[in-house]
Amino acid sequence: MSDQPSTPEPSALEKTQALLASLWQRNLPTLRQRLDTLDQAVAVEPIAPELLNEAIIIAHKLSGSLGLFGHHHATEIARELEHLFRNPSSAAPGRTKFLTQELRTTLALPEAPPTA
């Protein structure tokens, strides 16, 4: 018998939360890169076709993955962005830019500093 107090085993929920937190941290660089690409896409109207296609793919990926990490509002924003990118004529002027900024704010990921 050991004199040391036993440490309780983490619950399944705690293990899952720890795993998700680890995955979130590991994927932050990719997420920031995707947000930067969305920023580039909405910076100039009209969006270049290649950048528009990339923005559609990114918005789709974000709408499918952010909810897993508990970012349900961000999922809705990404879903709306995807719709607007797929149907550019339905976008109110500045709406995609606003939503891209809102997505970044919701995820608490500030814009990357400008590179020289």
Question: PLM ranges: what are they?
Answer:
Residues 24, 28, 65-71, 76, ...:
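N-terminal assembly/transducer modules of large multi-domain enzymes
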Residues 13-55, 97-111:
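Long, amphipathic alpha-helical coiled-coil segments characteristic
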Residues 1-15:
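Short, low-complexity N-terminal regulatory "tails/caps" that precede and couple sensory modules
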Residues 49-87:
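Extended, amphipathic alpha-helices with heptad-repeat/coiled-coil or helix-bundle character
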